[in-house]
Amino acid sequence: MVHFTAEEKNAITTIWGKVNVEETGGEALGRLLVVYPWTQRFFDSFGNLSSASAILGNPKVKAHGKKVLTSFGDAVKNLDNLKGTFSKLSELHCDKLHVDPENFRLLGNVLVIVMAAHFNKEFTPEVQAAFQKLVTGVANALAHKYH
């Protein structure tokens, strides 16, 4: 179980309250698909993923990115129960979708990069550390059913 200090919780909730889920989600998922192209195999139904511009402009990538980040928002609301929060999604990704759990870690790292770009000076090293802890906790919660 991940334990967050009061300062970490405050940093996470303060920044998360400013996140544009649609924009940030689409960009994070898009970057994942560009930077780690083998992850595209899970998104065959998304159409044209042939180039960075095609991926970043793809409405299905943007829509799914929003869906992913909306789920991530559940983590922010349930910082003390990440495993429980992601139990059903872990089961879905393990049993039905067969997603390599390493992809959750990759997406978390990409999300931190995107947020750093969006929030610039507000995304201090302390805020980054709190979010890195959160994305690691979410990745572990999503990978829970794999063990």
Curated annotation (Swiss-Prot):
Where does the chain bind heme b?
64, 93
Report the record's Gene Ontology biological process terms: hydrogen peroxide catabolic process
Record PTM Phosphoserine, positions in chain: 51
User: Which top-level group of life is the source organism from?
Assistant: Eukaryota
The identity of this protein, by name, is: Hemoglobin subunit epsilon
Per the record, its GO cellular-component terms are:
blood microparticle; haptoglobin-hemoglobin complex; hemoglobin complex
List the GO molecular function terms: haptoglobin binding; heme binding; metal ion binding; organic acid binding; oxygen binding; oxygen carrier activity; peroxidase activity
Report quaternary structure and partners: Heterotetramer of two alpha chains and two epsilon chains in early embryonic hemoglobin Gower-2; two zeta chains and two epsilon chains in early embryonic hemoglobin Gower-1.
| UniProt xrefs under InterPro entries | Globin, Globin-like_sf, Globin/Proto, Hemoglobin_b, Hemoglobin_oxygen_transport
Record-stated family: Belongs to the globin family.
Task: Please report a single Pfam family linked to this protein.
Answer: Globin
Keywords attached to this Swiss-Prot or TrEMBL record, sorted alphabetically, are: Heme, Iron, Metal-binding, Oxygen transport, Phosphoprotein, Transport
> Hey, what tissues is this thing expressed in?
Red blood cells.
Q: What does this protein do?
A: The epsilon chain is a beta-type chain of early mammalian embryonic hemoglobin.
The membrane spanning regions, by residue number, are none
Indicate the segments forming the Globin domain, all copies: 3-147
